[in-house]
């Protein structure tokens, strides 16, 4: 037996795209969106709604929705129907600073944030809203805007594929600049970050308060399951110290969560596996309430 081995140079570039694990939740949320549109078509006008169409009056309709001019013109009673406003501006900011490097289950906090942004972006674009996404730490690392619904997720995957956690804090001035430059009217701002980042940075809290004063702000943070587990392990001195540190972390994050809620910020806190659908549900609730 004889053999021959030879090496050939074959340069190539392979781009690893971030996974869209929460895609399985998209069909059910799209169904909820369609149901919401259907229900709102028979509701009276309210904040966050726009005129949809006219239809014939049926017993049980709210008399306040009667269009008297059209009724006189047609010779029959007709009512106005309304639907949630479309073409709202949704700005999603993914924190790519040092806290995004935290290990969570099979990935990092950054992976969880990117996956959650995929689901929310797909849902919001299907709802007719304008979606803009950026990764931010001390400066903007990625930016996706002006994409149609069918192109958005692919563009996000390509742009976010090269984003890695930056070993520094999320810059409050950079966040303030990003929001002020991209937003001229009321919008929905979603910050995918960590409560740990807020608990130690008063400047960041002040910027979030300013954004929440002008816009609807959602702060989404993934819970690290290991921290909760560490609080129950106290079999020796080392584990006891770890449990004390974990308890301290939970106390600080709970205080940060309460502070953000007092500022009028919607806080979404969930496990890595449930953060994406929880964020999508919060978006649907705000849209139904006309708060976008």
Positions of PLM-derived features:
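An amphipathic, basic-hydrophobic helix/alpha-beta surface used to engage anionic
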Residues: 1-151, 186-193, 199, 206-210
